UniProtKB/Swiss-Prot annotation:
Source organism per UniProt: Bos taurus
Keyword match Metal-binding: no
Membrane topology label: Multi-pass membrane protein
UniProt-recorded name of the protein: Transmembrane protein 205
N-terminal signal peptide: none
Length: 189
């Protein structure tokens, strides 16, 4: 730390690089790669790719959030914490919490539910098609109506997937707001 309680240049650079890298990764995974892969790969191949990428993605998000929280927390004067500093710390703590929930709890449950779904689908000859390529009635909708086990597995998968998506969006929003906070605190551009 430099004289006067200001973080050194290296600390500032590391904080900004880790935060912007995490946010960029989150933007890419959330809004680009998932949609491109979903529209271009067979369903089960898409699921396999996601099951390999997401553990790394969530753990990297968790690690980046931890590093950023440690950097910011070490720079704060805790006795004289301002509302602005507290809100920035809260955003990073929220990001760390949500990334940890995804990395350590939701990802494994979502993937297990997906594998169970895919097992039933493979038994029925489904999963090899690219989404949107099927003509006629939806075989997955028919399967839900015919097989209560499949319907229950699908509900379980979408419950975990929905919670994971909410946590991911929370991380993305927290990091984006923290980046905006850093930008607003800049004196020069």
């Amino acid at each position: 730390m430099e004289e006067g309680g200001n973080p050194g240049s290296l600390t500032k650079v590391v904080h900004l690089l880790v935060l912007s890298g995490a946010w960029g990764m989150q933007m890419w995974v959330t809004f680009i790669s998932g949609f491109v892969l979903f529209r271009g790969l067979p369903r089960h191949t898409f699921g396999l790719v996601q099951s390999k990428l997401f553990p790394f993605y969530f753990h990297i998000s968790m690690g980046c959030a931890f590093v950023n929280l440690c950097i910011l927390a070490s720079q704060c004067s805790w006795a004289q914490l301002t509302f602005w500093e507290a809100s920035q710390l809260f955003l990073l703590l929220l990001s760390l919490t949500l990334a940890t929930i995804n990395a350590r709890w939701l990802e494994s449950r979502t993937t297990a539910a997906m594998w169970a779904l895919q097992t039933v689908e493979k038994e029925r000859g489904l999963g090899g098609e690219v989404p949107g390529s099927h003509q006629g009635s939806d075989p997955y909708h028919q399967l839900r109506g015919q097989d209560p086990k499949y319907s229950a597995l699908r509900q379980q998968f979408f419950r975990y997937h929905g919670l994971s998506s909410l946590c991911n969006l929370g991380c993305l929003l927290s990091n984006g707001l923290h980046l905006a906070g850093l930008a607003l605190a800049l004196h020069n551009l």
